[in-house]
Amino acid sequence: MAETAPLRVQLIAKTEFLAPPDVPWTTDADGGEALVEFAGRACYQSWSKPNPKTATNAGYLRHIIDVGHFAVLEHASVSFYISGISRSCTHELIRHRHFSYSQLSQRYVPEGDSRVVVPPGLEDDPELREILIAAADASRATYTELLTKLEARFADQPNAVLRRKQARQAARAVLPNATETRIVVSGNYRAWRHFIAMRASEHADVEIRRLAIECLRQLVAVAPAVFADFEVTTLADGSEVATSPLATEV
């Protein structure tokens, strides 16, 4: 019986900032937030912080977002390793073209024991879950049968790696959209804000919405001055959404 895979989002990289020693400026933040402030001040050489309202890093970044100077947000980035996400969800995710992706390859990784991501609409219904798991088991059995026969068909191929790849790339056609995949996603702060605004909305598919909100929670921990304007609320159906009056790039 196919195992189910829960969503897991792991922070694996974030920006480090190294202040140039010859610039007469300090800040009360570090990492990506400091870099964004530095980039903004570099545009105007405002190292002396002449405006009291933007003298702190949080005040400066709030002003940057308020006035729509989003270009400076592109200097800082965050990377996540995401597992427990379905292939159907990553088909939506990779439409965000400002991100960089490295996804599990079904041509190289055998999927005979792959896990299944249960869609949100089926989670609380044992009968529907059972139907889903049965369908996944049937497709995996067909995948395994096809793989065996395809490897035999390509037996004349002397390169064993190529032979297995040719078999897997054909057999994977029968795998369901619910098959778990794993993916590394890297993006700058501006791209992440756009993703959250688009995919944490009540109009988004629930699976990618959950992903967006989990990413948001971790982004707030990394760069609160950049992401804390998003508010997470719960809808009548129990699902969560995140919105911000400052998320103007949608």
UniProtKB/Swiss-Prot annotation:
Residues 7-233 form the ThyX domain. Pathway: Pyrimidine metabolism; dTTP biosynthesis. Binds 4 FAD per tetramer. Each FAD binding site is formed by three monomers. A motif (ThyX motif) lies at residues 95-105. The keyword Nucleus does not apply. Keywords: FAD, Flavoprotein, Methyltransferase, NADP, Nucleotide biosynthesis, Transferase. FAD binds at residues 95-97, 103, 188-190, 194. It catalyses: dUMP + (6R)-5,10-methylene-5,6,7,8-tetrahydrofolate + NADPH + H(+) = dTMP + (6S)-5,6,7,8-tetrahydrofolate + NADP(+). InterPro entries: Thymidylate_synthase_ThyX, Thymidylate_synthase_ThyX_sf. The active site is at 199 (involved in ionization of n3 of dump, leading to its activation). Homotetramer. This is Flavin-dependent thymidylate synthase. It comes from Mycobacterium marinum (strain ATCC BAA-535 / M).
